[in-house]
């Protein structure tokens, strides 16, 4: 029943929610003018450490940072206490598992040059490149995915990894920066 109420609350905030959303705790949502956040069918958003013993440190955060940005989460995807921030576009495929406290972002948040870094006076100084996570990807707990990354379908990224470059489909990747460890034979 609470999930139905939370789905209705998300819809009232402007989130496009397909049927079957399950929530544990309340996610935090930030929409921008002309932006879109969409949740596919049967998504699970776990914002409570009571529902995930891996240690959810904060609620699921779905944030658009600039007008017209998009954040799309595919059908049957489960998220535990992660932050998903889109200045342009973040797209997560179907059947993904995203471990506790992951961060997926398509931007640097601040300018790299010292002038304006603190207050972001010029948004164009902040680097942004779309992020795509294809179907059936598993991101372990505390994984960070940075701007411009594409993760191929059926790939697993080990806990604590920092993904700075795109990864092919069907591999196990780990490390900071994440590197391919091996191919996953049985997919």
Where are these regions (language model features)?
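Domain-scale signature associated with acetyltransferase and cell-envelope carbohydrate enzymes
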Residues: 1-109, 134-136, 143-145, 153, ...
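A short acidic, glycine-rich active-site loop
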Residues: 61-67, 119-131
